[in-house]
Amino acid sequence: GPEGSTVLGKGHRTILTVLAQYPEGVDESQIAILTGYKATTRYQTLKELRARGFAKRDGERWAPTEEGLHELGDYEQLPSGRALLDYWLHRLPRGEKKIFELVVNSYPEAVSKRDLEEQSGYKATTTYQTLKELRARKLVTIDRGQARAAEGLFDA
């Protein structure tokens, strides 16, 4: 129904929502970052979703099935283009937001991790972890130590 089904627990809804928001599929490291769930919880929940026919796995990637989307009902869809950029700028934790803004402001140029460390004042490990989180959200691409804002963020 419109409110989603009672069959789904909170964890199932949360993970299924992430799958629905990224229809091209997400891997387990992305699911970890996007949900904050520990490995055992993720594993168990994905296993149950797949057993019920609500999620499918293709190689490393997980995606919702038609049944899964139907079961989920209404969920918050991610906007696209500039609206997605604004969406995340209002929702990212402070550390991620700071790094994200630096990467966005230098677009279309890429920024080196070293420059991001210097400009943000964060340690290398923090900068690296933050970039991994931004990449999981599909907000940045990372290539040879250079981070670039995702192209789609600048579409009208």
Descriptions of predicted regions:
Residues 1-39, 43, 48-54:
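Long, compositionally biased intrinsically disordered regions
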Residues 1-16, 73-101:
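Short alpha-helical segments that sit at the start of domains
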Residues 5, 34, 90-91, 122, ...:
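A composition-biased, non-transmembrane "mature-region" signal
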Residues 7-10, 21-24, 38-43, 91-94, ...:
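Short, low-complexity cationic-aromatic patches
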Residues 14-22, 58, 71, 98-106, ...:
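Short amphipathic alpha-helical elements of helix-turn-helix/winged-helix folds
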Residues 23-35, 107-120:
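Short acidic, hydrophobic short linear motifs in intrinsically disordered regions
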Residues 36-52, 56-60, 121-137, 141-144:
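Short amphipathic alpha-helical interaction segments
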Residues 58-78, 143-156:
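Accessory beta->alpha helical hairpin/"wing" motif in late/C-terminal subdomains of nucleic-acid enzymes
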